[in-house]
């Protein structure tokens, strides 16, 4: 499974961009294209959608945005174009609407019917409630870690070993919970937890864990 492409954005249109990587150009449709600038080097998380007639690559600014896109298109009647339209309203805004069971506001998004909005909330409300909770916990842990580093600078005798140990345990628990929500099996999750290296960016931590699972021979079909 290819998770992202890294390259230079050489062209940008209303709803797609062209990413150059090792001499090849990739046409990628993205939500909220204003976040991407021409001539910048950028990591873009990708999803390749293929049917009997076409193969289209969609791109995202973060791995979490990619996950949300996949969840949306898993709903019958919601295609990639509708999912991209929904993401144009903002990823966190969309997550908050789902978590809050606000299908009425969700249904105001272009191309998204009331029936589909209700189904999205029904399927994913609990998941994104937990996503928000995990994000909140991770932010608190990051703030705590920053405070601890400041203490180290101000007082070389400060002993925060126990606090750091607790932080690692909480991060592992949040990572395990996130991988479960993504549909990975307990054996795969346990394997990733033993192999993944610490990373202050939780999204990068998720990405690295998925890479480990994807590259492990014992989990390949």
Swiss-Prot record:
Renumbered residue ranges of the record's region Domain III: 167-221
UniProt GO BP: DNA recombination; DNA repair
Residues covered by region (Disordered): 133-155
Compartment list: Cytoplasm
Disulfide bonds: none
GO molecular function (one): ATP binding
Family to which the UniProt record says this protein belongs: Belongs to the RuvA family.
Domain notes: Has three domains with a flexible linker between the domains II and III and assumes an 'L' shape. Domain III is highly mobile and contacts RuvB.
Protein name per its UniProtKB record: Holliday junction branch migration complex subunit RuvA
